[in-house]
A protein has these predicted regions:
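Long hydrophobic alpha-helical segments that form multi-pass transmembrane helix bundles
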Residues: 1-54
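Membrane-helix interface "capping/anchor" motifs
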Residues: 61-72, 116-127
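Hydrophobic alpha-helical segments embedded in the membrane of multi-pass proteins
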Residues: 51-54, 72-80, 99-113, 127-135
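Cytosolic-side transmembrane-helix boundaries in multi-pass membrane proteins
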Residues: 140-177
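Transmembrane helical segments that form the transport core of multi-pass membrane transport proteins
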Residues: 67-88, 92-99
Length: 177
């Protein structure tokens, strides 16, 4: 039945762009930015199409299911740190774009980190939470044995949510400490 319905194979069996970046083979990552954005690349299930994940995240944002604080601070921190600490052999902007769009960053920032039960309550705490998730993600991607660090970063920051909420709790007006 395959020759009748499909003229060519639609399976990609190769290293993901993040694993190529992790191993230092920056020349192996020869994908166009548009290919990476629409998901025409190798990758794990659920993290392929940044475009569709972005559409889903923006839909939740516009329907007021989530706020902008966690996704923007999470993705922004990863973008800033990967740009600032890009390898000398790579173009910093290209390295940053591939690092942001390759892997589960969009899935984690838009859908996992914004879970009602595990994210901080107020906006300041949510920004701190997103920055922490982004910093831990970059640390794991650069220095640990894993290509991806989003899920581990979210789990570690979930342990600190109670402390972030305690530190960023608004003080009632007129009350002395």
């Amino acid at each position: 039945w395959v020759p009748i319905f499909a003229k060519q194979s639609d399976i990609v069996a190769s290293a993901t762009p993040l694993s190529s970046l992790k191993s230092g083979n920056i020349s192996d990552v020869n994908l166009d930015i548009v290919q990476v954005f629409i998901g025409d690349k190798a990758g794990c299930i659920g993290e392929i199409s940044c475009m569709l994940l972005l559409v889903g995240g923006l839909l939740m944002l516009f329907r007021r299911v989530i706020t902008w604080h966690i996704p923007v601070s999470f993705i922004g921190t990863v973008a800033f740190l990967t740009y600032a600490f890009a390898p000398q052999s790579a173009d910093a902007v290209s390295f940053m774009i591939y690092s942001v769009m390759s892997g589960g960053l969009f899935l984690g920032a838009w859908f996992m980190a914004t879970d009602y039960v595990t994210c901080p309550i107020n906006p300041t705490g949510r920004i701190i939470y997103g920055i922490g998730c982004g910093a831990i993600t970059v640390f794991i991607r650069f220095f640990a044995g894993f290509n991806e660090g989003v899920s581990f970063a979210i789990l570690v920051m979930n342990l600190l949510v109670w402390y972030i909420d305690k530190l960023t709790r608004p003080r009632p007006f007129g009350k002395m400490k």
